[in-house]
Design a protein with these regions (language model features):
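C-terminal target-recognition/interaction regions appended to catalytic cores
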Residues: 2-21, 26, 31-33, 41, ...
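Eukaryotic intrinsically disordered and solvent-exposed regulatory patches
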Residues: 38-42, 155, 309-310
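Short polybasic/polar patches that bind polyanions
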Residues: 43, 160, 296, 437
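Core alpha/beta nucleotide-donor-binding catalytic domains of modification enzymes
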Residues: 135-265, 270, 280-284
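Class I S-adenosyl-L-methionine
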Residues: 215-221, 236-393, 404-406, 477, ...
Length: 485
């Protein structure tokens, strides 16, 4: 084993690895950048006090290499830190030549990576994540591009209606115990393809997908303006009993840890903005606090809000937690609108003939008995929130209380209308159960559309004048053709 004496006062015997790495901030002094490394590790690699060395640019890329050389133009110094009781002496290397730094470092460099070997130190700039993202977005004719993950397809259509182009979709419906032998893993993905033409469809479990492969696929496409993440909400939702939440934690089926692969997706896609949609309880969870902190560390400005559907002209009482993180400061959530106070009944009457009578069903009786049944009445101004489990006829399903004392079960067409989903949105050849599930677990369309539109405007406001002019000219050139007929 090699040993080394760090200095005369502090003698330390230590194993010397073949390689030692560090990451340090680019130093500044008097308004000028300086590459400075002050470390006990320098003598380990032959850079003792007084040793001379060369400084040369790395060929073909940013960075520089320092090599010990008796005739080198620079030498290693030592510093003494009087305030330190532990290791007050450190050796130091500094490169301050402006011409060399301009050749070796990009203008946006903030941090440097040092790879130390015996007699050699390779210094490379660490990629400035947010600077690179901002630069790529500002150069686009239209930055409204989306990667939509964990979606049944409704929010895909919503992004399209808000002016976004859909570059990529990651959607995989996990098999549930009730599915038995019926494979439903492609149902949401098929619905997405009925409503968008993405460049890439990833029909893989977010917990198992190869993120390096996702990174490679993302690099083949355009920069992503918005990454949308509708994390599974079951284990945060008040609709799921606490006993079942605890059971899912014990048996490993809980979805509370989905925030981790979602962060990995942000890391490989490098979007300009990130949107999360979930139930309000998610915003108070430890998982969200972790998510928020890491995005902040990565250079995103993170904002969140609880949005309520009635305040955005929608017909249900759906309340949702939203987070929008952006590499561009200044995003603002859409302001609330006046809440409607007129009865909902007149708007839904045309759907009632197709809603089946369930007056004598056990689920209704049980729901009424325990107070969990959620009713639309002739005086209701809004519908209760539609749930993923609606079609199963659970105790907490939404029922319609008719004026004659009977009860009806909402048709899928009515559920679609209540959630504000356009009536021309196709669901393909899905079963009614899957169609209801997609509708119930989706979004309050008008509210979500207003947020997508706000994100789109936020992205377009960052464009450089030249790209804005190109986009405007392109629109003007296309207008005559629109009226050719």
């Amino acid at each position: 084993m090699q040993t080394v004496t760090v200095n005369a006062d502090i003698v330390a015997s230590a194993h010397i690895p073949s390689i030692i790495t560090k990451e340090l901030k680019l130093a500044t002094s008097a308004g000028r950048n300086r590459v400075r490394v002050s470390s006990n590790f320098l003598p380990f690699m032959g850079f003792e006090e007084g040793v001379r060395h060369t400084v040369e640019p790395l060929p073909g890329t940013y960075g520089m290499v320092l090599r010990t050389d008796a005739k080198g133009p620079q030498k290693v110094y030592s510093r003494r830190y009087a305030s330190r009781r532990n290791n007050p002496f450190e050796t130091q290397i500094e490169v301050s030549n402006s011409a060399m730094l301009a050749k070796c470092l990009p203008s946006d460099a903030e941090r440097l990576h040092f790879e130390m070997r015996r007699g050699q130190i390779v210094i490379r700039p660490v990629d400035n994540r947010t600077f690179s993202i901002r630069k790529s977005i500002r150069g686009m004719d239209d930055p409204r591009t989306a990667f939509v993950a964990l979606t049944g397809g409704v929010d895909v259509r919503c992004f399209r209606d808000a002016g976004f182009s859909i570059d990529s979709i990651l959607e995989y419906r996990p098999q549930e115990a009730r599915d038995k032998e019926n494979d439903k893993t492609e149902t949401g993905a098929v619905n997405c393809l009925m409503n968008a033409a993405p460049r890439v469809l990833i029909n893989e479990d977010i917990f198992r997908v190869d993120m390096d492969r996702v990174r490679a696929l993302a690099r083949e496409g355009v920069p992503i303006g918005c990454l949308s993440l509708s994390l599974q909400c079951d284990d945060f939702s008040s609709a799921k009993a606490n006993s079942l939440k605890q059971k899912s934690l014990r048996d490993g089926t809980s979805s509370r840890n989905m925030a981790y692969p979602a962060l990995r997706l942000v890391e490989v896609v490098n979007p300009a903005t990130v949107m999360i949609e979930n139930v309000p309880a998610f915003g108070a969870s430890a998982q969200y606090e972790m998510f928020r902190q890491i995005l902040t560390d990565w250079g995103y400005e993170v904002k969140d809000a609880i949005m309520e559907a009635p305040e955005h002209s929608d017909l249900t009482l759906r309340k949702r937690f939203y987070m929008v993180a952006s590499v561009f400061p200044g995003f603002e959530f859409p302001e609330a609108l006046e809440v409607a106070t007129d009865p909902l009944w007149a708007k839904i009457e045309r759907f009632l003939p197709d809603c089946r009578d369930v007056s004598h069903s056990k689920s209704l009786a049980d729901g009424l008995a325990c107070g969990r049944a959620r009713l639309i009445t002739p005086s209701s101004t809004h519908s209760p929130t539609i749930l993923k489990s609606q079609m199963r006829g659970a105790k907490d399903s939404v029922f319609i209380a008719m004026p004659d004392g009977t009860y009806r079960f909402p048709s899928n067409e009515l559920l679609q209308f209540l959630n504000g989903i356009p009536d021309d949105m196709p669901f393909g050849r899905q079963s009614k159960d899957i169609e209801s599930e997609i509708i119930g677990q989706s979004i309050s369309y008008g509210m979500h559309h207003r947020l997508c539109d706000a994100i789109g405007q936020h992205l377009r406001a960052q464009q450089q004048p030249a790209t804005m002019l190109r986009a405007t000219q392109g629109l003007q050139l296309s207008l005559p053709g629109m009226f050719a007929h």
